[in-house]
């Protein structure tokens, strides 16, 4: 029986306000995890910055850190928390998504996946045990199970076979995680495991898989294989189908999603955890989120705009600089431009989650969601 870590504090409709207790601090949910693929946010954002902008959880990538600097080096440096000077929770994804999306020459077998590194082409094998070993070396707070991220579209026959294999892989992940957590030299002996629900856009397969993995009594459950080309309506339909069949006393994580409007829709359906590279990636290109939706600071109309990115925003960029100045930095190819916009976008997302939590606490989430969607008008 897993230790009770999640407490449901309040429900407003299906929207959930909770707390998730971890060895590295208590996470207030719903939460957006800030993505630092290689143990850093792209855009010259430090772990100190993350604290300043309200980040609760940092997400790093198993596949990328395995390739460089190498998970064994991270372990020798005392684990990811010590390595990147971050004392709050870290979630590591299993590497599965990158293996299936980035790596070349994949061969999927029952034991795992054979593939070529996207960096130097060398042959690598990763299976459930290897993914758990790498994540154990990294010492993250939460490890994700190794699964196959099914391409969209896929035939029903292929999805059924893939989901059955993902279930067998999850059983192996759990067994290996239990073994690793018992070893004397393990970085984090309380490392937690989240399982991942798959099934493409086939609701009945999704539901059966949710029922199966629910019985494994894991620390949390993710809905994977979305935001890979399906429509928003298909994504929401899958969430509606799956959430009722996952345990109410465990957090639910929607992987890789997404836009602020997607987050509001998913929170309304009972989702607790989110992550996406979108706010940082957009920021690096001058696309920033505001209370009126997303704007592109590269546009000529901002050349003489003396306002902050988003009036009323308390992020470091908005408190100190104008749209005109930041646009100038982009045109001059100054790195500070990217840094300021990434800081702003991540602050925007973290503050959105704080406001969502307040709305659920106050029992006005439906009104809050409607107001935000109206303000953004399809631009966020």
From Swiss-Prot:
It is an enzyme of class 2 (transferase). GO terms for biological process: queuosine biosynthetic process; tRNA wobble guanine modification; tRNA-guanine transglycosylation. Homodimer. Within each dimer, one monomer is responsible for RNA recognition and catalysis, while the other monomer binds to the replacement base PreQ1. Pathway: tRNA modification; tRNA-queuosine biosynthesis. It catalyses: 7-aminomethyl-7-carbaguanine + guanosine(34) in tRNA = 7-aminomethyl-7-carbaguanosine(34) in tRNA + guanine. Binds 1 zinc ion per subunit. Pfam families: TGT (PF01702). Gene3D superfamilies: Queuine tRNA-ribosyltransferase-like (3.20.20.105). This is Queuine tRNA-ribosyltransferase. Its cofactor is Zn(2+). Substrate binds at residues 93-97, 147, 198, 225. Its EC number is 2.4.2.29. Belongs to the queuine tRNA-ribosyltransferase family. Residues 256-262, 280-284 are annotated as: RNA binding. It comes from Clostridium perfringens (strain SM101 / Type A). One of its GO terms (cellular component) is cytosol. One of its GO terms (molecular function) is tRNA-guanosine(34) queuine transglycosylase activity.
């Amino acid at each position: 029986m897993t230790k009770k870590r999640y407490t449901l504090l309040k429900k407003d409709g299906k929207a959930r306000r909770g707390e998730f207790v971890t060895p590295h601090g208590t996470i207030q949910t719903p939460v957006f995890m800030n993505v630092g693929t290689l143990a850093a946010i792209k855009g010259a954002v430090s772990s100190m910055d993350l604290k300043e902008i309200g980040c609760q959880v940092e997400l790093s990538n198993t596949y990328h850190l395995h390739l460089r600097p190498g998970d064994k080096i991270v372990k020798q440096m005392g684990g990811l928390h010590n390595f990147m000077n971050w004392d709050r929770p870290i979630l590591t994804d299993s590497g599965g998504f990158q293996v299936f999306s980035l790596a070349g020459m994949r061969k999927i077998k029952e034991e795992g996946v054979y593939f070529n590194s996207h960096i130097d082409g060398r042959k690598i094998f990763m299976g459930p045990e290897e993914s758990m070993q790498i994540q154990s070396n990294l010492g993250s707070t939460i490890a994700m199970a190794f699964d196959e991220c099914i391409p969209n579209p896929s035939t029903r026959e292929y999805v059924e076979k893939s989901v059955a294999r993902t279930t067998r892989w999850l059983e192996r992940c759990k067994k290996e995680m239990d073994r690793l957590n018992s070893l004397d030299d393990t970085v984090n002996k309380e490392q937690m495991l989240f399982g991942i629900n798959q099934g493409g856009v086939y609701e009945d397969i999704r539901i059966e898989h949710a029922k199966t993995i629910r019985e494994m009594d894991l620390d949390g459950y993710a809905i994977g294989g979305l935001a890979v080309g399906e429509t928003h309506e298909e994504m929401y339909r899958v969430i509606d189908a799956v959430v009722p069949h996952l345990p109410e006393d465990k957090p639910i994580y929607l992987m890789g999603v997404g836009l602020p409007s997607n987050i509001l829709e998913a929170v309304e359906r009972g989702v607790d955890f989110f992550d996406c590279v979108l706010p940082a990636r957009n920021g690096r290109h001058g696309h920033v989120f505001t209370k009126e939706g997303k704007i592109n600071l590269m546009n000529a109309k901002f050349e003489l705009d003396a306002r902050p990115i988003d009036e009323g925003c308390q992020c470091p960029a908005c408190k100190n600089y104008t749209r005109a100045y930041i646009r100038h930095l982009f045109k001059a190819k100054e790195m500070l431009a990217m840094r300021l916009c990434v800081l702003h976008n991540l602050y925007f997302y973290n503050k959105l989650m704080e406001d969502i939590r307040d709305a659920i606490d106050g029992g006005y989430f439906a009104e809050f969601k409607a107001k935000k969607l109206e303000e953004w008008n399809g631009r966020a």
